[in-house]
A protein has these predicted regions:
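Extended, helix-rich architectural segments
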Residues: 1-158
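Residue-level preference for well-ordered alpha-helical positions
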Residues: 71, 349, 402-406, 442-446, ...
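Surface-exposed loop-to-helix/strand elements on domain peripheries
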Residues: 84, 89-94, 313-435, 470-473, ...
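Extended, regular secondary-structure scaffolds
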Residues: 111-118, 123-245
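Short coil/turn segments at secondary-structure boundaries
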Residues: 112, 126-129, 272-279, 358-364, ...
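Amphipathic alpha-helical protein-protein interaction segments
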Residues: 120-127, 334, 443, 453-457
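Extended, charged amphipathic alpha-helical segments
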Residues: 212-373, 424, 428
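Charged substrate- and nucleic-acid-binding regions of tRNA-handling and nucleotidyl-transfer enzymes
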Residues: 431-481
């Protein structure tokens, strides 16, 4: 069993704050946010109360559920093409079971889009795998330092990636930084540096992990013209003109933690106060046990459930008549509380850009829990919303894949940004198709559109393709008499 050291801090406060923000979101998206919810609960309520609540309830995570609902761009594998003059050169790269297909690039992009929407940025490291295939490795921003020149703020020229490595002799794990630096284009750098806990570089380990010095003329990542490049692609959820936009949707993140806090309290009520409790007065409760002796949360209590009767003994200091009765249940109307939490969750999802009216309800009961399952029309809207910004990153990734394959695998793929990506939209439902047909027919009857425009709208074709389809339909009617 290995001892994994804590992740080192980054050298400046601005980067460290960004990293901590991104790390919380990553944990919420990956499902490892239990300790974060526990800390949030303890900041909301007194420790003595927290001790009675039991385990946390992580069933509600509006932030992650909303990101998952919006990440639909790669639900179907996109189509990639090139101009005719590049077709023969690009065919081994883009064809079925070609180099890009074997790398599982678009399958990986499903996870990349999911995390990009939540964290607002994602990094993709393009490399060659041990099996001599292209490798697209997603890296979350909380493990990366990057900066870009003021004149080109979306194109980084220096990137550090924190990576955990092992000393094969001592078997100890330690943190390193893979450094890619193009600030001096005449002297590009690729290094592996050992990182101290305060983020300072203490030792150059390039000879051990890279096999030698990779600076200057030895820099390995160059295109067919010999120009150095960074083997990285930065994906953005929205183009803001900045390299990082880490604090957008912060209200949704904190609100999701708050909603989970409400569900933890609801669980506590269900388990501990969903029944009327019997009691007596002027007597002492027998069988009390002390918990947390000597701690801040020390308390005396006894287990009870709906079938229990609490036993008391006479109070020697009180001669009054004992009384027997019961308290009303603390949770008298769970539906009212669930409805209030559901309204709160809907407001959070609307802040993510999900229209509550477009969400498909799992149950017709308005008190039912909130489930984010968008309609097909809203899913297509989400695809259109993200298609342009992700197309920029996808083209860069495919171009980088071609450059690295040419450099290290001896291929000859096009290195120019000539790749065209067509994302496959979610098909219309039968109801939507019927409404579309009726709308097109009405417009044609009113003389608002012609036959070519109608075919374009119905089948999503270009004008030339629509004309050709109309000719085919006319020929078939003549031939078959229909």
């Amino acid at each position: 069993m290995y001892d994994i050291p804590a992740v080192p801090t980054f050298p400046d406060n601005e980067t460290q704050l960004r990293v901590e923000t991104s790390a919380l979101r990553r944990r919420m998206l990956e499902g490892s946010w239990g300790p974060d919810l526990e800390r949030y609960l303890q900041s909301q309520i007194d420790l003595s109360r927290r001790a009675t609540w039991g385990t946390i309830d992580q069933s509600s995570n509006v932030f992650a559920h909303s990101c998952k609902a919006l990440a639909v761009l790669y639900s179907e594998k996109p189509l990639v093409g090139v101009p005719r003059e590049f077709r023969e050169q690009a065919e081994p790269y883009l064809q079925h079971d070609g180099a890009l297909d074997r790398s599982n690039f678009f399958s990986i992009m499903q996870s990349v889009q999911y995390k990009t929407i939540g964290i607002r940025e994602m990094f993709l490291r393009v490399d060659v795998s041990d099996s001599k295939e292209l490798l697209f490795r997603p890296v979350t921003p909380d493990m990366v330092y990057a900066s870009a020149p003021a004149g080109d703020p979306l194109k980084p020229n220096v990137i550090y990636e924190y990576r955990l490595r092992q000393n094969m002799q001592t078997k100890k794990m330690f943190w390193t930084a893979d450094v890619y630096d193009l600030r001096d284009e005449d002297n590009p750098k690729y290094q592996v540096q050992k990182v101290d806990m305060d983020g300072t570089f203490t030792e150059d380990l390039s000879d051990i992990f890279l096999g030698g010095n990779m600076d200057g003329a030895n820099y390995p990542y160059r295109d067919s013209q010999g120009k150095a490049f960074l083997p990285w692609v930065v994906y953005h959820a929205s183009m803001t003109g900045k390299l990082f936009n880490p604090y957008e949707l912060s209200s949704v993140v904190s609100g999701s933690l708050q909603a989970s806090c409400y569900y933890c309290f609801l669980k506590h009520l269900f388990l501990d106060s969903a029944w009327p409790q019997r009691y007596v007065s002027n007597l002492q409760l027998a069988g009390l046990s002390t918990y947390g002796t000597g701690e801040q949360t020390q308390r005396m209590s006894i287990s009870a459930d709906p079938s229990s009767i609490l036993c008391f003994v006479p109070d020697p200091d009180n001669q009054s008549q004992p009384m027997i009765g019961q308290f009303e249940a603390g949770l008298k109307d769970p539906n009212q509380m669930i409805s209030a939490i559901t309204v709160y969750e809907r407001r959070l999802s609307s802040m993510m850009g999900i229209d509550p009216a477009s969400v498909t309800k799992v149950s017709s009961d308005p008190r039912s829990g909130y489930s984010i399952a968008m309609s097909q029309a809203s899913t297509r809207d989400a695809q259109r919303r993200f298609s342009e910004v992700f197309r920029v990153g996808d083209v860069q990734s495919i171009v980088l894949g071609a450059k690295i394959s040419n450099r290290f695998l001896g291929t000859n793929y096009p290195e120019e940004p000539v790749y065209n990506i067509q994302y496959v939209a979610v098909p219309m439902s039968p109801e939507e198709l019927k409404a579309q047909r009726e709308d097109i027919i009405q417009k044609m009857e009113k003389g608002l559109i012609g036959h070519v425009e109608a075919i374009q709208d119905l089948y999503d074709l270009t004008e030339e393709e629509a004309v050709e389809k109309l000719r085919t339909i006319r020929q078939q009617r003549i031939e078959f008499g229909t």
